[in-house]
Regions:
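Glyoxalase I/VOC metalloenzyme domain signal
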Residues: 1-120, 127-217
Length: 217
């Protein structure tokens, strides 16, 4: 699972990363062909990433992220008109993405070089982890390392590469989202006062592998 971060210019982002000694791949154009189309449409996005194995003396992202530019906003307007941006659980957007890492300080150095700004510290007792928040537009990336060898986060890292362990999704109607989640899972979801507002939590067993926090401001 990867996090794609929307940027205003893939070209400018790639140029900046190169000045910071990153082994950059892209900008690479991409598009989707609809059924029946025989000719690829013009590029609908441009993506920028770093090499999986950076060249000697070069940097690369070791958490699963990439940058993406959508040259035109027409796709979103069309999707909204077709109702494809509306969700039965009233989800508005993914506000925060939580990454399980071995060494927060090391990741912070790399991501600061990439232009991200570090924010507050964060302790997550449920995962037995602590770390730092990084600002990402109107949302956040949260880097977490294990606080003890038997923690939930440490168990995750024993079977995975560094990656996304949890998401915080904002909803417009928490009660409706909670009712829908309880109906689908067959279990009761208790609410709590979370970092971003009143929240409830879905376990990885119900979400194909990640903790999913839903909250309402």
């Amino acid at each position: 699972m990867f996090l794609g971060l929307n940027v205003s210019s893939a070209k400018v982002a790639a140029s900046y990363l190169r000045t910071q000694n990153f082994d950059v791949e892209g900008p690479d154009p991409g598009s989707l062909m609809k059924e029946g189309e025989t000719k690829p449409p013009p590029p609908q996005w441009y993506s920028v990433g770093t090499a999986d194995k950076p060249a000697p003396n070069k940097q690369g992202f070791s958490v699963p992220i990439f940058l993406i530019e959508y040259p035109s906003g027409d796709w979103y307007d069309k999707a909204r008109k077709e109702g494809r941006t509306e969700h039965p659980n009233t989800a508005i957007d993914i506000h925060a993405v939580w990454f399980a890492v071995h060494d927060v300080k090391s990741q912070l150095r790399t991501l600061r070089d990439a232009g991200f700004e570090a924010d507050e510290s964060r302790d997550v007792k449920l995962l037995g982890a602590h770390g730092r928040v990084l600002k990402a537009g109107s949302g956040a990336m949260i880097l977490l390392e294990s606080s003890d060898k038997s923690s939930v986060l440490q168990k995750y890292l024993s079977g995975h590469d560094e990656g996304i362990i949890a998401l915080s999704v904002e909803v417009s109607d928490l009660r409706k989202a909670q009712s829908m989640a309880e109906s689908v899972t067959g279990g009761k979801m208790d609410t709590y006062k979370g970092t971003y507002g009143k929240s409830f939590l879905l376990s990885p067993d119900a979400t194909h592998g990640v903790w999913l926090e839903m909250f309402q401001r």
